[in-house]
């Protein structure tokens, strides 16, 4: 996956000792670049990240596949399926690489094949589908929902909401649906509202742990 590839970059570095920051990026409005802090130039870091991105999305061992007119999916190659974790992670990568075209294609696939539009799981996404869009399971996996919301809010701030997809509205729809769920129909918020932690799954069993 993209995250595994990035982990390899980290492993290949010989970093200097890094000091933790006292304040996070939300407060400082500045993201730290630990690769630059480790002694690499910004140009080297950008080139390496671009190389990994191109390999994972377009290389011979890619996980990204474009289908139909304007859709795409990120495949779990080992299990030969499409999972909300991979799709939402793919959206996070796309928005951070400023690839609106990729982001929109992945999200359209999610909307068409994965997102529930009615019933107790409305707003949530079926966690696993076949590559043709047929659902392997109906239930959601909470980390996918969390990354969907985060990626959509990033996209709203980067590209605005009048360029084809209203990203903020889509994020709010997921959140509004989540906060309307109280477990009475066997489905909860994907965040445990007591402990303020992501749940394993938002059903009554997985809601108890992260």
Q: Which ranges hold each PLM region?
A:
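Bacterial N-terminal signal peptides
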Residues: 1-11
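Low-complexity, Ser/Thr/Pro/Gly-enriched N-terminal "stalk/linker" regions
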Residues: 13-85, 96-131, 135, 186, ...
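Sec/Tat-exported extracytoplasmic proteins
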Residues: 56, 95-98, 114, 118, ...
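Aromatic-rich carbohydrate-recognition surfaces in CAZymes
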Residues: 80-87, 134-160
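Solenoid-repeat scaffolds in large eukaryotic assemblies
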Residues: 90, 102-103, 164, 171
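Aromatic- and glycine-enriched pocket-lining scaffold segments that form the walls
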Residues: 153-210
């Amino acid at each position: 996956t993209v995250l595994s590839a990035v982990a390899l970059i980290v492993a290949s570095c010989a970093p200097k000792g890094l000091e933790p920051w006292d304040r996070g990026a939300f407060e400082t409005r500045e993201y730290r670049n630990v690769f630059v802090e480790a002694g690499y130039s910004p140009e080297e870091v950008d080139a390496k990240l671009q190389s990994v991105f191109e390999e994972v999305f377009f290389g011979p061992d890619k996980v990204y596949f474009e289908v139909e007119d304007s859709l795409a999916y990120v495949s779990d190659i080992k299990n030969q399926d499409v999972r909300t974790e991979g799709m939402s992670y793919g959206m996070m990568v796309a928005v951070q690489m400023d690839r609106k075209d990729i982001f929109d294609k992945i999200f359209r696939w999610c909307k068409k094949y994965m997102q529930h539009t009615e019933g107790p799981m409305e707003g949530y996404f079926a966690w696993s589908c076949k590559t043709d869009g047929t659902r392997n399971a109906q239930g959601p996996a909470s980390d996918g929902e969390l990354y969907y919301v985060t990626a959509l809010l990033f996209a709203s701030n980067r590209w605005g909401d009048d360029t084809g997809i209203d990203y903020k509205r889509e994020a709010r729809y997921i959140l509004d649906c989540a906060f309307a769920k109280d477990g009475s129909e066997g489905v909860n918020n994907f965040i445990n509202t007591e402990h303020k932690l992501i749940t394993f799954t938002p059903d009554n069993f997985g809601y108890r742990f992260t």
